Amino acid sequence: MALSKVKLNDTLNKDQLLSSSKYTIQRSTGDSIDTPNYDVQKHINKLCGMLLITEDANHKFTGLIGMLYAMSRLGREDTIKILRDAGYHVKANGVDVTTHRQDINGKEMKFEVLTLASLTTEIQINIEIESRKSYKKMLKEMGEVAPEYRHDSPDCGMIILCIAALVITKLAAGDRSGLTAVIRRANNVLKNEMKRYKGLLPKDIANSFYEVFEKHPHFIDVFVHFGIAQSSTRGGSRVEGIFAGLFMNAYGAGQVMLRWGVLAKSVKNIMLGHASVQAEMEQVVEVYEYAQKLGGEAGFYHILNNPKASLLSLTQFPHFSSVVLGNAAGLGIMGEYRGTPRNQDLYDAAKAYAEQLKENGVINYSVLDLTAEELEAIKHQLNPKDNDVEL
């Protein structure tokens, strides 16, 4: 069966049906949600730093703290607006810094803690106590701790959010199958930061963000808007530059993702990649625009459940063979496919076409200007013969 015979769903009718709705729904964010403002940003950044300097840190709450930091950069008002625009009923909890005194080994100690509904005073104090142990050890080893190794370095919060930027691109897979790729990428782009901080453990931090995004989907909307706002703001630190690169690459600015689907288990890459880079593909763009109107995870899962959209009209591409093979690989057609294909005709057509292109040597790897990392990912995905691949 030819790809050209596979028909799209009638998205226009669906769109008209949804547009005609006179009602909206309200989702709940839970009992209350902490909405920190700019004034506590420095303290939350320091909390992130305490986790980073702690050797073998427990990162159970790092995802949550990272999101609190992102919200403090957006500000309380914008955070609430983002949530309300996404259909959430928000009972906002203001966040302040207070002083807490506690007896530690017979000695009264003073701690500054945040008035959070989501993170108890006890947890915050434990994070600080553990970080103090590591800091004492650093003082013994280094004599004096340089500013970039300290817990109050201004980029601590953004270092943690770089891992969130990697995690968010993998959510549409519906599982944590992208964790290995997140760890590998984090080890590469944050290698300098890992030399600074012994508590920067990509696997543990990534799992913490997975947990937060899975349990609290409203944070996904907040993070996407934060990422766009952060990336569109000029200037900033080196780590802010890294974050913008990771975030914008993940959201479709990188054509390698579009062509190869190496990271296509995140449907968000395909969706925004096609819509922004290949606007001439009217049928595909129609579906993607429709999915964007659905918004949030609903739109991404719509595309996940309709993989045919990303495999149609591909003959219009200058390097259409590469794109077909890339999308086929990304959808699991050339790699591992989990579960039963939702559209057997599409699956068979795409698989046959992609295999034919591969066998006939139609794909010209050398014109794609791949980095060593991308080449490694493609080798892993497609297992080409060594002489097929040139850099």
From Swiss-Prot:
Post-translational modification, as annotated: Tyrosine phosphorylation modulates viral transcription and replication.
GO biological process: symbiont-mediated suppression of host cytoplasmic pattern recognition receptor signaling pathway via inhibition of MAVS activity; symbiont-mediated suppression of host cytoplasmic pattern recognition receptor signaling pathway via inhibition of MDA-5 activity; symbiont-mediated suppression of host NF-kappaB cascade; symbiont-mediated suppression of host PKR/eIFalpha signaling; symbiont-mediated suppression of host type I interferon-mediated signaling pathway
Residues the record lists as Phosphotyrosine modifications: 38
A GO CC term assigned to this protein in UniProt: viral nucleocapsid
Molecular function GO terms recorded: protein serine/threonine kinase inhibitor activity; RNA binding
Entry keyword annotation includes Phosphoprotein: yes
Documented effect of changing residue 132 to A: Almost complete loss of viral RNA synthesis
Location of the protein in the cell: Virion; Host cytoplasm
Residue segments, region Interaction with the phosphoprotein: 31-252, 244-290, 338-364
InterPro entries, per the entry: Pneumo_ncap (IPR004930)
Top-rank lineage group of the source organism: Viruses
Keywords: Capsid protein, Helical capsid protein, Host cytoplasm, Host-virus interaction, Inhibition of host innate immune response by virus, Inhibition of host interferon signaling pathway by virus, Inhibition of host MAVS by virus, Inhibition of host MDA5 by virus, Inhibition of host NF-kappa-B by virus, Inhibition of host PKR by virus, Inhibition of host RLR pathway by virus, Interferon antiviral system evasion, Phosphoprotein, Ribonucleoprotein, RNA-binding, Viral immunoevasion, Viral nucleoprotein, Virion
Purpose of the protein: Encapsidates the viral RNA genome by forming a left-handed helical nucleocapsid that protects the RNA from nucleases. RNA replication depends on the availability of soluble nucleoprotein. The encapsidated genomic RNA is termed the NC and serves as template for transcription and replication. Together with the phosphoprotein, sequesters host NF-kappa-B in inclusion bodies (IBs) thereby inhibiting this host defense pathway. May also act as a modulator of the innate immune response by sequestration of host IFIH1/MDA5 and MAVS into IBs.
Protein family according to the UniProt entry: Belongs to the paramyxoviruses nucleocapsid family.
Subunit and partners: Homomultimerizes to form the nucleocapsid. Binds to viral genomic RNA. Interacts (via N-terminus) with the phosphoprotein P (via C-terminus); the phosphorylated phosphoprotein P binds to N-RNA complex. When in a monomeric RNA-free form, interacts with the phosphoprotein (via N-terminus). Interacts with protein M2-1; this interaction allows the association of nucleocapsid with the matrix protein. Interacts with host EIF2AK2/PKR; this interaction inhibits EIF2AK2 phosphorylation of EIF2S1 and blocks EIF2AK2-mediated translation shutoff.
Record-given protein name: Nucleoprotein
